[in-house]
Amino acid sequence: MINWFPGHMAKSLRELKEKQKVFDLFIILLDARLPLTSFNPEIYKIANKKPILFIFNKADKTNKDKINAFIPQYQKMGEVILSNLKDKKSILKINSKINNIYKLFDEKNKLKNKLTPPLKCVILGIPNIGKSTLINALANSRVAKVGNIPGITKSEQWINCNKYLLLDTPGILMPKLGSDDVGAKLAIVDSIRIDALNINEVIVEIYKLLSKTNKWVLEKINLAPSFDEEQIFAEINQYARRNKILKAGNEIDLNKSIKLLLQYFKNIDNIIYD
């Protein structure tokens, strides 16, 4: 079974629980190709008593028709934005949404004759989901640290975006993934470090996942869907022969073939794995 939960993730989860009261807004990034699997219930347990903004990143790579079916369940928990963090329009939309949330805080404070400080926003999500990309885009190269904030260590860097402050956090996975399907889904979007796993095991689980959810991805390069490990490697060997992925002596380079297939799988567009 594919699993990966290094010690620093457990530590980050503990620290979030301890500092929950410090944050005004939880910005939770999700992968639009994994609208269910990229949701970490451990993070939601910490965030669910505060305002939440869900941002589905990589909306440009998902299936536009299917993703909309998942949105209503998230709208029950918070605000939702579909985005491509490399697109300026998406960043403007996110910035506008955060500023609108600030206005709600400000309106409440005005009734109490109180000034509204910048919102303290923490950005959360599984690894490689785009947290740093979002911070860089919203900050627009402003990387100055702000002053000390109670409950936060000096080593943690807040980015000042005028009406709000942003705090990045390490990517956090679920302590137990629960099934090979989940591990394969996270591996195919690079949220699990494949180089820390057995590459043969990874390719088998991803191949099975695609055979189950998106067999057209395999058929596009003349691979037959299969759930049998022996047959899967037979298909990979044939793929290597067809594409002349060989070592000296006309021997199949299995490792290179697997890496090329993984790269192909990761770059597929118009897809949902959940």
Each model region followed by its residue ranges:
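Helix-rich effector regions associated with P-loop NTPase G domains
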Residues: 1-26, 32-34, 39-41, 46-53, ...
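Conserved P-loop NTPase mechanochemical-coupling segment
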Residues: 1-2, 135-146
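Canonical P-loop GTPase G-domain recognition
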Residues: 53, 60-125, 143, 246
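Short phosphate-engaging motifs
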Residues: 90, 130, 165
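Alpha-helical scaffold elements adjacent to nucleotide-binding pockets in ATP/GTP-utilizing enzyme cores
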Residues: 93-97, 137, 205
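Glycine-rich phosphate-binding P-loop
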Residues: 119-140, 169
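Short, flexible micro-motifs
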Residues: 128, 133, 143, 154, ...
